[in-house]
Amino acid sequence: MKFSELWLREWVNPAIDSDALANQITMAGLEVDGVEPVAGSFHGVVVGEVVECAQHPNADKLRVTKVNVGGDRLLDIVCGAPNCRQGLRVAVATIGAVLPGDFKIKAAKLRGEPSEGMLCSFSELGISDDHNGIIELPADAPIGTDIREYLKLDDNTIEISVTPNRADCLGIIGVARDVAVLNQLPLVEPEIVPVGATIDDTLPIAVEAPDACPRYLGRVVKGINVKAPTPLWMKEKLRRCGIRSIDAVVDVTNYVLLELGQPMHAFDKDRIEGGIVVRMAKEGETLVLLDGTEAKLNADTLVIADHNKALAMGGIFGGEHSGVNDETQNVLLECAFFSPLSITGRARRHGLHTDASHRYERGVDPALQHKAMERATRLLIDICGGEAGPVIDITNEATLPKRATITLRRSKLDRLIGHHIADEQVTDILRRLGCEVTEGKDEWQAVAPSWRFDMEIEEDLVEEVARVYGYNNIPDEPVQASLIMGTHREADLSLKRVKTLLNDKGYQEVITYSFVDPKVQQMIHPGVEALLLPSPISVEMSAMRLSLWTGLLATVVYNQNRQQNRVRIFESGLRFVPDTQAPLGIRQDLMLAGVICGNRYEEHWNLAKETVDFYDLKGDLESVLDLTGKLNEVEFRAEANPALHPGQSAAIYLKGERIGFVGVVHPELERKLDLNGRTLVFELEWNKLADRVVPQAREISRFPANRRDIAVVVAENVPAADILSECKKVGVNQVVGVNLFDVYRGKGVAEGYKSLAISLILQDTSRTLEEEEIAATVAKCVEALKERFQASLRD
């Protein structure tokens, strides 16, 4: 919003300069974007009168004039402006004057005729871009007066950013209120004398949409001269606010809009059939707007209509049919309060953003309409003449906004501000803001003024008190708080540490929606009940996920469709499992899951193209589990999962409790999801791993280690992990390493059996092991394997 500094000072005039005023407005929460002078830098320009005006003898487009500037004689000035005429009061740059751009006025001859000055246009004085003719001043402009003084050009245009909550400051009155409060000065409002009705002419008004339009005022003004010129003082105020003068009627409504923040509209009364009806638009109804475009209206659009057709979009834009034109003699002035919700979004739907819709969307003072109507009527009659009828007021009190009583507690005020403000100051601030205040014990009861829609809760009052008291007046004090430092156990494993490990292994973290497609989820978890949303964003996002695989596999498909075939991603997040024993019937588990597919390595000339397999993912997963210190307690067991390949998957158990799955996606599921090639997934219940085993320091043996290899034949269904676990258990004191380095099936091994080659690393921390001890330990392992798994040594 732009406004004139001098216009603001007519309402409240603090004893501070322009820079201090701009800073004060900014600190009040109305950020000043710029302060610009309203005219260029010039001097030596005065008010003059064209006494004589004749055609130049040597030029068709020039005139020779004699101009009275209040001196001893008339000045001879040659002028080329088409509007130059005898009797006109003008702005005269006399000899010695300096105009914007350091243009100096000197005596000269133009086509043989002497010229002792220049008759100036607005553009030549740096006031506006209007260069169509010289400035036409009122007939009563005092001759010889400095034009800067007469037009009050020692003024600034202040532009502010008004936040949506401060709609009351979209008018001079709102900004003036804040400045008056901050400087503890009275607000000097212009005297608005009610215009009594001198005629009985009215139009019937019916409000059929009281929720959208709680108050509607209409007034007939007859016999106006719409061609009457707008006074220069009004044009200048409008210009300094960024509004171009149109005609007297439009200028008056714009003036009231800028002054009071109340949008108004004028209809050509003679084009209204029957009366005014405020209603919602009919489906498919159209309206030709003032700019000539046709708007197709929706049923939720408020319209001002007569008994046959729509005349205007309520609170947004007028219609062409009922607009004021050069032939208009009788008008109906409209002044209304429209509910913000009935206007919000309607203008944008039609590609519009008007000054009226901007204000109505944010909220207009519901108590302002009578004042604005009287102000507009007085200005219109003073400028255009005419006679006014009575004001017709249709108000639905039940739908008008009501201001609730807000309690402000002393404890809350002190706690949020961090500084004690005296009771009498708090009361004074609230009352200066326009609140009705009742003081209590350590509290205040306040009713916000009608123009402050943003004052609704206790925190709003705290903000207002702090703002008016002055943020700069609140002393800087160290924050005093009782801090309870959070404990961090050494046994806590940070999920961030695990993510870093996966990042180092080439994985990228993703975040997918918790809302998933129930059809896809049923493919991954057939027969498992999921939580369905009553009001989903879409059908494809109508179920809560049972695992992270649904979103991760969809991400893989998305990337493969964009030629990204090597994918390594992971995600941590909640799954939502229906559980009657859980709060609200839903168990929320924090999960860690990942997916890999494509080549094992990035493409490189020295590396063969090898596709990832089960052991690639299992190795990465073991690295994660190793961070917990529980890898030795983890078992990978063959266990069916409908989403995984039955021969290339495993359930993950920790101390006998299942904590997740790892494996290749089932070929049938791959086909249904349009996955390209082998895809492997894992998922872990993170909360069962977050408590890690703290590593214990131990002595490093200075004595040599001994390796012994054995090959044992066992049944095909015996897991190799069980064999390794048994070897560790038997040789717990001397066996420091057990590793499976070969699996053989074929000649020499019976069908249904396999040969496992295992290395045993034996070492003692206190001495060198004797060969007999080593042999005894190896024999003990073989015997244990024979007893438990019916294993035999392979020849």
UniProtKB/Swiss-Prot annotation:
Q: Identify the residues that the record assigns to the FDX-ACB domain, covering every copy.
A: 701-794
* Gene3D superfamilies per record: 3.30.56.10, Bira Bifunctional Protein, Domain 2, Ferrodoxin-fold anticodon-binding domain, Nucleic acid-binding proteins, Phenylalanyl-trna Synthetase, Chain B, domain 3
The answer on whether this UniProt entry bears the keyword Ligase reads yes
Asked if the Swiss-Prot or TrEMBL record annotates the protein with the keyword Nucleotide-binding, the reply is yes
Q: What is its main location?
A: cytoplasm
Under the heading InterPro entries, the entry gives: aa-tRNA-synth_II/BPL/LPL, B3/B4_tRNA-bd, DNA-bd_dom_put_sf, Fdx_antiC-bd, Fdx_antiC-bd_sf, NA-bd_OB-fold, Phe-tRNA-ligase_IIc_bsu, Phe-tRNA-ligase_IIc_bsu_bact
- Binding residues for Mg(2+), per the UniProt record? D454, D460, E463, E464
| UniProt superkingdom | Bacteria
Reactions the enzyme catalyzes:
tRNA(Phe) + L-phenylalanine + ATP = L-phenylalanyl-tRNA(Phe) + AMP + diphosphate + H(+)
Keyword terms of this UniProt record: Aminoacyl-tRNA synthetase, ATP-binding, Cytoplasm, Ligase, Magnesium, Metal-binding, Nucleotide-binding, Protein biosynthesis, RNA-binding, tRNA-binding
Instruction: Kindly list the cofactors needed.
Output: Mg(2+)
> Which Pfam families is this protein grouped with?
B3_4, B5, FDX-ACB, tRNA_bind, tRNA_synthFbeta
Annotated B5 domain ranges read 401-476
**Cofactor comment in the record?**
Binds 2 magnesium ions per tetramer.
**Cellular location of this protein?**
Cytoplasm
Sample GO molecular function, one term: phenylalanine-tRNA ligase activity
One GO BP: phenylalanyl-tRNA aminoacylation
E.C. no: 6.1.1.20
Domain tRNA-binding residue range list: 39-148
This entry carries the following GO cellular component terms, namely: phenylalanine-tRNA ligase complex
Q: Which family does it belong to?
A: Belongs to the phenylalanyl-tRNA synthetase beta subunit family. Type 1 subfamily.
Concerning HAMAP family, the annotation shows:
Phe_tRNA_synth_beta1
Check the record and name the PANTHER family matching this protein: PHENYLALANINE--TRNA LIGASE BETA SUBUNIT, PHENYLALANYL-TRNA SYNTHETASE BETA CHAIN AND LEUCINE-RICH REPEAT-CONTAINING PROTEIN 47
Q: How does it assemble?
A: Tetramer of two alpha and two beta subunits.
Q: What is this protein called?
A: Phenylalanine--tRNA ligase beta subunit
Give the gene name.
pheT
